[in-house]
Amino acid sequence: MLQSEDIDGQCINCHHYRNYKTDNMQFHVRQLKGGTIIVNGDEVKKINLKTDSTISAGVYPAWHPTHNFIAYSINDTGQSFHTKNNNKIEVQDLKSDLILYDIDRNEVSFIEHDTLEWEVFPAWAPDGKTLYYNSAHYEIQN
């Protein structure tokens, strides 16, 4: 078991499991020692999904139900803090795309990459044949 105290209290979030089992899972560690931890059977590795051509590292994950793939949205996010309730924080995406991480090959490829579309929240169909996600058209009007 990993606890945030093991990594100096840093944020651990966005846990995701293949088929709700702990044999295959992933989670993100944020800040200085950040990265994505992938558990694939007995193998545990830390990866960085940020490349020169991506907006960010992986954000919102979705394990393929049968293959060693994880779809991620990659997002440029911002936070808004409420003045009336200091504990309430809103997060919004400023940009987003979708990538596919091939665990066996350690390769990242784009699923969607369009500056006028925001793609987020990937989810595989139970049979793994279809990847669903939210998409919103974004264009600044003059």
What is each model feature region?
Residues 33, 93-97:
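A detector of repeated loop/turn-to-beta-strand junctions in beta-rich toroidal repeat architectures
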Residues 14-17, 60-62, 121-123:
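Conserved beta-strand position repeated once per blade in WD40 beta-propeller domains
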Residues 1-10, 39-57, 99-118:
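Multi-bladed beta-propeller domains
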Residues 19-21, 65-66, 126-127:
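Residue-level detector of Asp-centered blade-edge/turn motifs that repeat once per structural unit
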Residues 28, 37-40, 81-85:
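Short, solvent-exposed loop/turn and secondary-structure capping segments
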Residues 72-93, 134-142:
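Short, conserved, GDST-rich strand-edge loop motifs in beta-rich repeat architectures
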Residues 1-35:
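Preference for long, solvent-exposed alpha-helical segments and helix-linker "stalks"
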Residues 24-28, 69-73, 130-134:
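Residue position within the beta-strands of beta-propeller blades
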